[in-house]
């Protein structure tokens, strides 16, 4: 990252548009847009093209990537623009109720978390071919670390309040503590269960009496569940 304040004069028209889209979203709703939203607004057809532009903006000092979180992007510097849309966003914010509105500097503490779809055998969970989308999530809710999201399928965790269709945010780590909810890989499929270890071995426990505990000796712990999200 360059030293000192980023230079807006170094931006291309497209990069300026991307930052404008990010800035307007932060002002209006308190968090940045998704990768797909950025692409739609900037005329980029693929998420890889958006990712390339974000990387260029990182080099110029407008965004920051944590080397320990290769799939996360923290929005750090948003140039003050005088575009018509930016002025409209600022005016809309001034007219909106202030309760619950976040300071843009605080809203900048946001990571784009990859949504993982089908998982290729042997590949890392956040390998490019596994990622379907990125979602911006506030750090105060999901914490830090190398994060990814999985959608829950099935009712095995119903009694813990984790339902089919929910999204779980997972922090990548190869180990777990007793009683923690984890995402684990078993026979090529991801599952969410409670981690349990006793004299009889290691188990992945469901929270639904109609499901049986799963022996976990051959399971791969992908990470700890840190948040659950649900669309109402």
Swiss-Prot record:
InterPro entries from the UniProt entry: LexA, LexA-like, LexA/Signal_pep-like_sf, LexA_DNA-bd_dom, LexA_repressor, Peptidase_S24_LexA, Peptidase_S24_S26A/B/C, WH-like_DNA-bd_sf
UniProt keywords, alphabetically: Autocatalytic cleavage, DNA damage, DNA repair, DNA replication, DNA-binding, Hydrolase, Repressor, SOS response, Transcription, Transcription regulation
GO biological process, one term: DNA replication
GO molecular function per UniProt: DNA binding; serine-type endopeptidase activity
EC number in record: 3.4.21.88
Residue numbers annotated as active site: 156, 193
Organism domain of life: Bacteria
UniProt site (Cleavage): 121-122
Disulfide-bond pairs as recorded: none
Pfam family, one: LexA_DNA_bind
Catalysed reaction equations from the record: Hydrolysis of Ala-|-Gly bond in repressor LexA
Annotated signal peptide: none
Positions of region (Disordered): 61-104
DNA-binding region: 35-55
Residue ranges, compositional bias (Basic and acidic residues): 61-85
Low complexity: compositionally biased ranges: 86-99
Family classification: Belongs to the peptidase S24 family.
Stored PANTHER family: LEXA REPRESSOR, LEXA REPRESSOR-RELATED
Function: Represses a number of genes involved in the response to DNA damage (SOS response), including recA and lexA. In the presence of single-stranded DNA, RecA interacts with LexA causing an autocatalytic cleavage which disrupts the DNA-binding part of LexA, leading to derepression of the SOS regulon and eventually DNA repair.
Complex and partners: Homodimer.
Protein name: LexA repressor
Organism: Corynebacterium glutamicum (strain ATCC 13032 / DSM 20300 / JCM 1318 / BCRC 11384 / CCUG 27702 / LMG 3730 / NBRC 12168 / NCIMB 10025 / NRRL B-2784 / 534)
């Amino acid at each position: 990252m360059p030293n000192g304040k980023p230079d807006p004069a170094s931006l291309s028209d497209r990069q300026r548009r991307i930052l404008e889209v990010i800035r307007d979203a932060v002002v209006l709703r308190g968090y940045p847009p998704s990768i797909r939203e950025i692409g739609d607004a900037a005329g980029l057809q693929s998420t890889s093209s958006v990712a390339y532009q974000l990387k260029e903006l990182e080099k110029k000092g407008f965004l920051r990537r944590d080397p320990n979180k290769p799939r996360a992007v923290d929005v750090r510097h948003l140039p003050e623009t005088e575009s018509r849309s930016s002025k409209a966003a600022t005016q809309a914010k001034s007219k909106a109720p202030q309760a619950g509105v976040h300071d843009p500097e605080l809203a900048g503490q946001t990571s784009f978390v990859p949504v993982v779809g089908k998982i290729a055998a042997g590949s890392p969970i956040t390998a490019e071919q596994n990622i379907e989308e990125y979602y911006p999530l506030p750090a105060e809710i999901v914490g830090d670390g190398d994060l990814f999201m999985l959608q829950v399928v099935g009712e095995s965790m119903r009694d813990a309040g984790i339902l089919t269709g929910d999204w779980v945010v997972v922090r990548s780590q190869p180990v777990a503590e007793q009683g923690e909810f984890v995402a684990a890989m078993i026979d090529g499929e991801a599952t969410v269960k409670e981690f349990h270890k006793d004299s009889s071995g290691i188990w992945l426990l469901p929270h639904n009496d109609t499901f049986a505990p799963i022996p976990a000796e051959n399971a791969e712990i992908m990470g700890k569940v840190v948040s659950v999200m649900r669309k109402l």
